Design a protein with these regions (language model features):
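Domain-level signature for soluble enzymes in the chorismate/prephenate branch of the shikimate pathway
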Residues: 1-117
């Protein structure tokens, strides 16, 4: 339960932020930074697409030799390396784990399609 004093402090600490600003220079800089982000987002999707194509090729190789899709040793090596690389670039470990688990699951899905043909 929140006391009246605590509620008062919450309101004091509360900062209402504007959705945008009318300053032309600020808007120009925001547009520039957002354009950079858009460009990087496009590259991320492009790279992920290429990665999935490679996962499919690996799936084909595994199919030819009847090798299991999930390779725990390899997965653990990738995770460890990516966590360290992420930390060096200021990325939170949990964030890196979430991203790579999603990428890994998508890779498995692509390989399953190949193996189950």
């Amino acid at each position: 339960q929140v006391t009246p004093a605590a509620l008062k402090q919450i309101f004091i600490d509360l900062k209402m932020r504007k959705e945008t600003d009318e300053n032309a220079e600020w808007n120009k800089e925001m547009a520039l930074q957002r354009a950079y982000i858009d460009e990087l987002d496009t590259k991320l999707i492009e790279i992920l697409g290429k990665r999935m194509k490679l996962a499919e090729k690996i799936g084909q190789l595994k199919k030819e030799k009847n090798v299991a899709i999930l390779q725990n040793k390899r997965w653990n090596e990738i995770l460890g390396r990516m966590i360290l690389d992420g930390e060096e670039k200021g990325l939170n470990e949990e964030f890196v784990l979430k991203i790579y688990k999603a990428i890994h699951q998508e890779s498995i899905t692509h390989q399953e399609k190949i193996i189950n043909k």
